[in-house]
Amino acid sequence: MNGRYVGYVAGHDPLHDFLTRIIRDHMGVREPQPAYRVFRLSGSNEVYAYEEKFSAAKIICKFYGSRFGWDRDKAAWMARQEYEGLETLRRYNLIGSPHHVIRPLGISRDINGVLAVEFYSGEGFSHAIARATRHRDDAHLYWRLKALAYFLATQHNRTANGAGVDFEPDCRYFDTVVGRLEQADRIGQWDIDELSWLRDCWRDRPRMWQDRQVWLHGDATPANFLFGHGMDVAAIDLERMKRGDRMFDVGRVAGELQHAFMSAVGDWHRAEPFIGHFLWEYSCHFPDRQRTFESITARAPYYMALNLLRIARNDYIGRDYGGRLVARAKKLLRAA
């Protein structure tokens, strides 16, 4: 079990009964005196893994409570939203091999707004990227990107609803990110004016409005995908799931790849073969691969830039590197 071991769940803790109901009702485990080991998982949210000592049954719990100042109703609403998002995607037969959306197992308003989901054993996307950036294991990352492209193309194609995309919300999100960069004193007024002008240039391009809406993962970062055997991929953490342009997901993956190589080896060019491979593999799941590839590569720079700006706003990003991210984002936005 990954994560830092922090002890056992006390028998009188309401969480103990919550976990026991889940392993009994969803896993068929009827241990008379269950005991749960607790592991704190890394990440920005309060996420813990629980392993029942005798049966080895595993559950992941995500707690929303502390994020909202202990507003139980808000926390419960967020937990319910993610629960329903997981159920929604699973109804499109994204279950099992090779495409899997993790199964939600339960929620509780009164236990810190907890959402319980199944445990999926697999390699994290971030680990696959690190094998390439740190150990030059490029073949492994190429294989994982092929699998991820297959997963996302399947999710997007199965969930397309025929309605046209609305690019305006992605422009508003761009403004939100730029505003946070300004608040963090990462950019000045000249940068804001230039970024706003570039945003308007993209808004005026018909291609940004011409695709069909799909269900998006909404936070397609390396932390939120796990790889199993062969082409198996599992998606986790769907709290930001929404309808929109498929490029919001695809471009975020591409932007994360560029960031990974910029931060690890100092060279955005090293990411280009992987980004191209990912976009090409995504395109192969459409009737006209070449036309699809041309369409998504024409839109990708906006969403890649948006992701680099999103990363640059974070406190853990050094000021010099944040400046490089902003500069790279501008170059992407200037693309034809």
Language model segments and positions:
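Conserved short submotifs of the Hanks-type protein kinase catalytic core
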Residues: 111-124
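Active-site acidic catalytic loop and adjacent metal/ATP-binding pocket
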Residues: 37-61, 202-248
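Regulatory N- and C-terminal appendages and interdomain linkers associated
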Residues: 1-39, 54-56, 313-336
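ATP-binding glycine-rich loop module of kinase domains
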Residues: 49-81, 137
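Short beta-strand micro-motifs within the conserved protein kinase catalytic domain, predominantly
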Residues: 98-113
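Active-site activation/catalytic loop segments of kinase-like enzymes and analogous catalytic loops
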Residues: 249-287, 304-321
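An alpha-helical support segment within catalytic cores of ATP-dependent transferases
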Residues: 14-32, 160-217
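Conserved kinase catalytic-core helix
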Residues: 88-95, 123-166, 205
